[in-house]
Swiss-Prot record:
SUPFAM superfamilies recorded: Snake toxin-like
Major site of localization recorded for this protein: secreted
GO molecular function, one term: toxin activity
Keyword Disulfide bond attached: yes
Gene3D superfamilies given in the database record: CD59
Similarity comment: family membership: Belongs to the three-finger toxin family. Short-chain subfamily. Aminergic toxin sub-subfamily.
Cited Pfam families: Toxin_cobra-type
Gene Ontology CC annotation, any one: extracellular region
Record note on modification: Contains 4 disulfide bonds.
Location in the cell: Secreted
Tissue specificity annotation: Expressed by the venom gland.
Name this polypeptide is given: Muscarinic m1-toxin3
Cysteines joined through disulfide linkages: C3-C24
């Protein structure tokens, strides 16, 4: 899984996380980063 580390709209950063630890979706990073901020 890929987790969003920064909620920046223009320059979101991500990192790989163990499955089940953090449920973030890379495809949503540039659309609504804050939407998945609560999953971290």
């Amino acid at each position: 899984l890929t987790c969003v580390k920064s909620d920046s709209i223009w320059f979101p950063t991500s990192e790989d996380c163990p499955d089940g630890q953090n449920l973030c979706f890379k495809k949503w990073q540039y659309i609504s980063p804050r939407m998945y901020d609560f999953t971290r």
